[in-house]
Regions:
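Long, charged amphipathic helices and adjacent flexible linkers at domain junctions
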Residues: 323-331, 447-450, 454, 488-489, ...
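Structured functional modules or segments
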Residues: 592-666
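Catalytic cores of soluble metabolic enzymes centered on carboxylation/carboxyl-transfer
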Residues: 259, 298-529, 658, 664
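Structured, non-catalytic alpha/beta "coupling" segments that mediate domain-domain communication
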Residues: 77, 87-94, 336, 346, ...
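N-terminal beta-alpha lobe that positions the nucleotide/phosphoryl donor
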Residues: 1-274, 278-297
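Conserved nucleotide-binding/hydrolysis modules and their immediate coupling elements
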Residues: 307, 515-521, 525-542, 546-553, ...
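Conserved bacterial/organellar gene-expression machines centered on ribosome-associated P-loop NTPases
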Residues: 397-403, 408-418, 589-603, 607, ...
Length: 666
């Protein structure tokens, strides 16, 4: 077994590999850029080597710099994680020449499967079901439009060397095919150093289901069942689960056997994932094979009990798999939610900055439930504009799907993140969505259920009244504390009344509080009531309450005359006032936001790739105005209405902050 391995990656996956290596008694070496000097993976590793400036193109994907770090530390093997150099054949070959073991598949398999055009041809030869499409190289946007018309819209435009949702576009028209081709080509060149593009038919209403395979160097190959990855936004997975709520045993077996057949056909060893799209009749088609560890591998580990990172290391060291196909049973259900530094209220635009608060739920493992959090950040650390915006992968396991979902709801409610925009509210909303709970999902779920983007969650009246009761009870605790603070008028003790008006979500709810030693009963003016008990104290950001015998978790922040309360995806300003205060508050004018309709503002921190118009030019609704690159993704900003460009304030190559002016209209 290896004594020392180097992890050619960063963030949560580097931390994840370090954990398994540490368990196996193997020393670890981290690499880091200037931006990651104080990163968690650097702190966790036994050794760390600096490899360059923040941009990945100058550090994490420079093969020579990784090779220098290997020579400097004497590492015997390298785990590439995912992304960066994980599917780079030249890197695997460089390691082989150096006599260093690559913890992954052999370079011919990487070459064959890393190229989506070649892999599709090989899949067909191996008897794997495939989607119709054009597998040749496409020279320019005109040819892309021509081929798209021959295949028939909609089509999927994809980078041959792509992955992770980068370099992928769905086109429904000639215009979208033309724009999508150029954006995919640019993203592919920036992310993978390979701008080749191919086009295939887009299967409407598909599910994205993938099979985890594991093969050793002794001829053994097994599949560790499937992962359902259909909850996606812009082809980037958001929520995954294992097993799939859609597959039956026969389809699962057929998909697993085809995945192993493909792995054997290319001489594959190590962990790999064969991705399929599955239609409503359970017909499945090969999508691609990822010759690396997947982001979502924890859900497979949770339902099989197999440490995939450990097995990758053991296979690389020449050991045989310790189990056969018949040993790999599905045990329970696992969910994974990807916590991203992106603002769901601003169309999921990337967010950067310092994590002023980062308190994940307590990790635990019992026979009835597991909470696991894979992360690469810590409180006080920074989220950089240079890398993927993922903060953490929150996973839950339980005996049933319903229990795993409920475990995830609670875990999300107790996850505290402040300082940056994040998608926790959106993840909570999906977990509560009836269609998700039912399992009736496709890759179009987010686009169909949130066509205007995420606008927040409106709580049903039953939940709203529980929040109102909790807020009233917490407000009473805060008021009593304020009444007892020293420095008030002598011989005067401020009275805390029982009658309050709770304002939230556009509603005013009149309540009367009857408090006792154990808690408070909050009475509503319609004769109903809620019993609230809690040990919450003013200033605590997380309130764990019991409302009518049921646990309720609220994230709590102080605002004038009340609280900011976040729960189950809802973000509420809850005002708790005396009846007189409520009467006066109704008379107060509301402050109007400034009018920015004549400006194109930068929606995220990023780099201006292109300004598509000129001063004095008339633009039409939907016309491309500028392209901003952030978190390795290109974002095209379009005109919201017809107008004339008065002034352009930014230029290509400029680095902008949120709300910086890009251009002004007449």
């Amino acid at each position: 077994m290896f004594k020392k391995i180097l992890i050619a990656n960063r963030g949560e996956i580097a931390c994840r590999v370090i954990k398994s290596a540490r368990k196996m008694g193997i020393r670890t070496v981290a690499v880091y850029s200037d931006a990651d000097r104080n990163a968690l993976h650097v702190r966790m590793a036994d050794e760390a080597v600096h490899i360059g400036p923040p941009p990945a193109a100058q550090s994490y994907i420079v093969i020579d710099k990784i090779m220098d770090a290997i020579r400097q530390t004497g590492a015997e093997a390298v785990h590439p994680g995912y992304g960066f150099l994980s599917e780079n054949m030249k890197f695997a070959e460089a390691l082989e020449k150096e006599g260093v073991v690559f913890i992954g598949p052999p370079s011919p398999a990487i070459e064959a499967m890393g190229d989506k055009i070649t892999s599709k041809k090989l899949a067909q030869e191996a008897g794997v079901s495939t989607v119709p499409g054009y597998m040749g190289l496409i020279a320019d946007a005109d040819e892309a439009v021509k081929i798209s018309n021959e295949i028939g819209y909609p089509v999927m435009i994809k980078a041959s060397a792509g992955g992770g949702g980068k370099g992928m576009r769905i086109a429904w028209s000639d215009e979208e095919a033309r724009d999508g081709f150029q954006s995919s080509k640019n993203e592919a060149a920036a992310s993978f150093g390979d701008d080749r593009i191919f086009i295939e038919k887009f299967v409407t209403q598909p599910r994205h289901i993938e099979i985890q395979v594991l093969a050793d160097k002794h001829g053994h190959c097994v599949y560790l069942h499937e992962r359902e990855c259909s909850i996606q936004r812009r082809n980037q997975k958001v929520i995954e689960e294992a097993p799939s709520p859609f597959l039956d045993a026969a389809t699962r077996k057929a998909m697993g056997e085809q995945a192993c057949a493909l792995a054997r056909a290319v001489g594959y060893t190590s962990a790999g994932t064969v991705e399929f799209i599955v239609d409503g009749n359970r017909n499945f088609y090969f999508l691609e094979m990822n010759t690396r560890l997947q982001v979502e591998h924890p859900v497979t580990e949770l339902i099989t009990g197999v440490d995939l990172v450990e097995q990758m290391i053991r296979v690389a060291a020449g050991e045989a798999l310790p189990f056969a196909q018949g040993d790999l049973k599905i045990n329970g259900w696992a969910m994974e939610s990807r916590l991203y530094a992106e603002d769901p209220y601003r169309n999921f635009l990337p967010s950067i900055g310092r994590l002023t608060r980062y308190r994940p739920p307590v990790e635990a493992a019992t026979a009835t439930g597991v909470v696991r959090n894979d992360t690469g950040v810590y409180e006080g650390g920074e989220i950089s504009m240079y890398y993927d915006p993922m903060i953490a992968k929150l996973c839950t396991w339980a005996p049933t799907r319903a229990e795993a979902i409920e475990g995830m709801r609670v875990a999300l409610d107790t996850f505290e993140v402040e300082g940056i925009g994040h998608n926790l509210p959106f993840l909570s909303a999906v977990m509560d969505h009836p269609r998700f709970v039912e399992g009736a999902i496709t890759t179009a779920f987010i686009a169909e259920e949130y066509p205007e983007g995420f606008q927040g969650v409106t709580l049903p009246m039953g939940q709203l009244r529980k929040v109102a009761a909790a807020a009233a009870a917490m407000n009473r605790v805060a008021e009593i504390r304020r009444a007892r603070i020293s420095g008030t008028l002598g011989n005067h003790e401020r009275h805390v009344g029982d009658d309050w008006v709770v304002g939230l979500q556009g509603e005013e709810i009149v309540v009367k509080i009857a408090a006792d030693r154990d808690g408070a009963t909050v009475h509503f003016d319609d004769g109903t009531s809620h019993r609230v008990t809690s040990d919450w104290a003013p200033g605590q950001p997380l309130a764990r309450l019991d409302v009518d015998g049921e646990p309720v978790v609220l994230k709590v922040g102080k605002i004038p005359s009340g609280f900011r309360i976040r729960t189950r995806g809802a973000d509420l300003k809850v005002h708790v006032r005396t009846p007189r205060q409520a009467e006066l508050a109704r008379l107060m004018p509301e402050k109007q936001p400034p009018d920015t309709s004549k400006y194109l503002l930068c929606p995220m921190p990023g780099l201006v790739v292109k300004i598509s118009v000129e001063e004095g030019q008339e633009v039409q609704e939907g016309q491309a105005l500028a392209t901003i690159e952030a978190m390795k993704m290109e974002n095209i900003l379009r005109a919201e209405k017809k107008g004339v460009v008065k002034k352009i304030a930014a230029s290509a190559g400029a680095s902008l902050k949120v709300d910086d002016v890009i251009m002004e209209f007449e």
